[in-house]
């Protein structure tokens, strides 16, 4: 007789995993245009939450070695962490996203969308931080891109880490999601700060007609997994609705914690 646990395991194994998708064919520019071409208030909320978390990191000054995991075609994580960063690394797997990020970091100007998000960042930090009107020079001097899988993150390397909408958007398997969260939590030195956001009840997403995976998760399930691998967890649920606002998005949970 098959036990419930065996049934659950078999069901999980039939779901698509990270390796089943053509990440090399990910259309980075199409993704950017769809998700960031028209800034949404919830994106601004991510920045405000992240800025508050970063401001609370112990120690003054721009002295942290920080990684963003699964960056994708997105500069928002850089903006959030720049004021406290000595060095910022985008840890990204897809070749297309790596090339897109490298080109974006070399630009001498900001796209209007990025300028909007930087303006939100400056406001979130406040005038006492004296942030410049454009982050272009800060980005060029502090940011770099490393190609790598979330599952291959080195342990205990960074002072702080961010991960926005990555672990749940690379697989349909719960075991792989938890492995990604665990790798994220362990990449920071003990006592370091972890800042993350996860999609809630996402139904999946397409980029240029090609479908990519999302794990359909409740806020409670996300919080439980995150708490298994971090300490001092704080959670805020943002914009969660029944119907998707845009494909693959119906709200998120924002989490902070401390690496063990």
Question: What residues fall within each predicted segment?
Answer:
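Conserved SAM/SAH-binding beta-strand->alpha-helix loop
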Residues: 94
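Acceptor-substrate binding/catalytic loop of class I
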Residues: 202-224, 245
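A short glycine-rich, Lys/Arg-flanked "PGG" loop and its adjoining helix->strand segment in the class I
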Residues: 175-190
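S-adenosyl-L-methionine
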Residues: 106-152
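A short SAM/SAH-binding and catalytic strip from SAM-dependent methyltransferases
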Residues: 159-175
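Conserved SAM-binding loop of SAM-dependent methyltransferases across substrates and taxa
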Residues: 73-86
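Class I SAM-dependent methyltransferase Rossmann-like catalytic core
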Residues: 2-62, 76
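Acidic carboxylate diad motif detector
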Residues: 196-198
């Amino acid at each position: 007789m098959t036990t419930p646990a065996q049934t659950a395991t078999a069901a999980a194994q039939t779901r698509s995993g990270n390796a089943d998708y053509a990440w090399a064919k990910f259309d980075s520019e199409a993704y950017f245009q769809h998700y960031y071409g028209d800034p949404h208030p919830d994106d601004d909320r991510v920045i405000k939450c992240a800025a508050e978390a970063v401001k609370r990191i112990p120690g003054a000054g721009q002295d942290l070695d920080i990684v963003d995991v699964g960056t994708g075609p997105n500069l928002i994580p850089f903006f959030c962490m720049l004021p406290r960063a000595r060095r910022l690394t985008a840890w990204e797997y897809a070749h297309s996203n790596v090339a897109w990020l490298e080109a974006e970091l070399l630009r001498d100007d900001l796209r209007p969308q990025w300028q909007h998000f930087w303006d939100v960042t400056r406001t979130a930090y406040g005038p006492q931080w004296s942030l410049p009107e454009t982050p272009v020079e800060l980005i060029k001097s502090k940011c770099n891109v490393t190609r790598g899988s979330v599952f291959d993150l080195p342990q205990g390397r960074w002072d702080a880490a961010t991960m926005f909408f990555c672990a749940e958007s690379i697989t349909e398997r719960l075991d792989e999601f938890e492995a990604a969260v665990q790798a994220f939590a362990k990449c920071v030195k003990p006592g370091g700060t972890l800042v993350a956001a996860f999609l809630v009840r996402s139904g999946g997403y397409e980029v240029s007609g090609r479908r990519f995976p999302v794990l359909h998760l409740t806020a409670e399930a996300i919080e439980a997994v995150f708490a298994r691998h971090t300490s001092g967890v704080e959670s805020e649920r943002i914009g969660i609705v029944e119907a998707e606002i845009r494909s693959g998005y119906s709200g998120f949970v924002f989490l902070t914690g401390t690496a063990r």
